Structures are given as structure tokens and as C-alpha cells.
Amino acid sequence: MSDSFCPDCKKHTEVAFDHSAGDTVCTECGLVLEAHSVDETSEWRTFANESSDNDPVRVGGPTNPLLTDGGLSTVIAKPNGAQGEFLSSSLGRWQNRGSNPDRSLILAFRTIANMADRLGLVATIKDRANEIYKKVEDLKSIRGRNQDAILAACLYIACRQEDRPRTVKEICSVANGATKKEIGRAKEFIVKQLEVEMGQSMEMGTIHAGDFLRRFCSTLGMNNQAVKAAQEAVQRSEELDIRRSPISIAAAVIYMITQLSDDKKPLKDISLATGVAEGTIRNSYKDLYPYASRLIPNTYAKEEDLKNLCTP
């Protein structure tokens, strides 16, 4: 339910949606506020085909404003039976011969959706990545470039812009063979192209160590007390002049916190969970070590407990 202004009640009230009739109804007085509205989302009901074991839906997906026809094109089905198969295959050939300017876009959007699903990303990030790709594709400047790297870079930029950043290594793990270097180059290319087109710098969003911390801690199976201590330590680290990448700082803080825990984590495991090299974690830890008493909350470890930390 949601709220809407009811002219009879003279106030905002909760409204109910009658999907079968397309009506929006006030729950307090029963007034129909809107009638015969069109639901453009995908239909959830299915209707079984009596002649087969399939259970197809009657309609396709929701409209997509990035496609020429809104994604509402007609698809020729293939019925059972010898005569039907001959007819449908002939029609299908004619349909495939017809020009579809959105075919490459549909394939690109499908690839982006698959990558996003594998990373557990929300729909808003998928939509933003689709928008970025559509803008770049319209500029006709990506022909001849590594398509997998371009799509992965669009997803990386979308994560940054939606304040849900992922590391390049995480994006690379679902990028269908594109390397970190290729994705990095594609990202720089896309940003440059769009900045030239817009005539202004492209907002990418600022990365903080805390953006990655909870996900890394979850991967390592850290308890809630250790996670909270790590989050507070990361926040305090922003007050210091530590010239390391946010990902490296997050990894070093985890290394520091787990040393003071009963459930210690080997440096190798932290490296695998964060994607940061062991040597880089050691160097970042070396920079953080002198500030351990300022970083680690007293509720997690006392001053004398800090002596248990490894000397870098």
C-alpha cells in the first residue's frame, strides 16, 4: 500500500490497488481515485498450454525506455505439429531477416544483467549500467573494442555512481574473460568519451574503505563484535593522513582487528577475501600500526591488549 490524497476524506490516506480492474481505491471511504490504469510491469500470472508441459506467460517483460520500441516487439512462437513447425520456422526466418536495431542492445543488457546477478547487485545498478552503455553505444565510439571489457566497465561505473562500489577484481570475476587491465582501460575510455559529450566532469562517487568492509568481513565469517570494531576503526582512519587505497586500508584494518580476536584470520585468507596482495596489506598495516591505539575501540581491545599486535 501507499499514500495518496483523497478528496472525500480531505487528507492523505492509504490506497489499495485492484490489479484486476486497474483501480486505485481509498481504504477509508472506498472512493475510486483512479480507474482503468495500465500496469506496464511484467504479468506474473501464467496460463498452462494444454497441449504441452510448458507453462508460458502470455506477455513479455516490462517496457524498456532504452529500446526503440520500448521492448514491446512481437515474437513469433513455435507451435507443436509438423505443419505448424513448418509454418513457424518460415515465419521465424522472415522475422530474423528483418532489421532489429536493438538486437545488440538487448544482448548487451542481458550480459550486464547476468554479471549484476552474479554479484548480487540491485536493479538500480543494472539500470544505471544499461544507461551508461546506451550513451556510449550511441556515440558509435566502441566499435572494434573489447565488448566484455566495455560492459564490465559500465557496471563498475554504475556501482560507483550508485554508492555501491565493487573492486575491479570483483567485476573482473564475472566479466567473461576481460582482464583487470582491459576493464580499467575501458573505464577510462568511457569516462573520457562521456565527459567530452557532456562538456563536464563525470561524477563517479567517492570510494571509502567502509564501502567494502562489511562485505569482506562477511566473506571471512567474522563475528558481529569484530565487524563493528573494524567499521569504527575504518571511520577513524579517515581522520588520518594514510595515503593508501580504501581497499588496502579495509584489508589492513581487518588484519589488525582479527589479530586481537580469538578467531584469528591468516593473512592469506584476508588477501583472498579482499583481492589485495599480501605485500600490499603488510605495507598498509605498517602505516596504520603507529595509530593502533587511536583506531581500535576501547570496547574491543584495551591498551595492554594492543601489545599482541604483530610488529610490522
Curated annotation (Swiss-Prot):
Q: Which SMART domains match?
A: CYCLIN
Q: Where are the zinc fingers (TFIIB-type)?
A: 2-34
Give the species this sequence originates from: Oryza sativa subsp. japonica (Rice)
Sequence ranges of the sequence repeats: 115-192, 216-290
* Taxonomy, superkingdom: Eukaryota
Q: Which residues form a coiled coil?
A: none
Q: Which UniProt keywords apply?
A: Metal-binding, Nucleus, Repeat, Transcription, Transcription regulation, Zinc, Zinc-finger
The record's annotation in InterPro entries points to:
Cyclin-like_dom, Cyclin-like_sf, TFIIB, TFIIB_CS, TFIIB_cyclin, Znf_TFIIB
Query: Which cysteine pairs make disulfide bonds?
Result: none
A molecular-function term among this protein's GO annotations: RNA polymerase II general transcription initiation factor activity
What is the protein name given in its UniProt record?
A: Transcription initiation factor IIB
Q: Which family does it belong to?
A: Belongs to the TFIIB family.
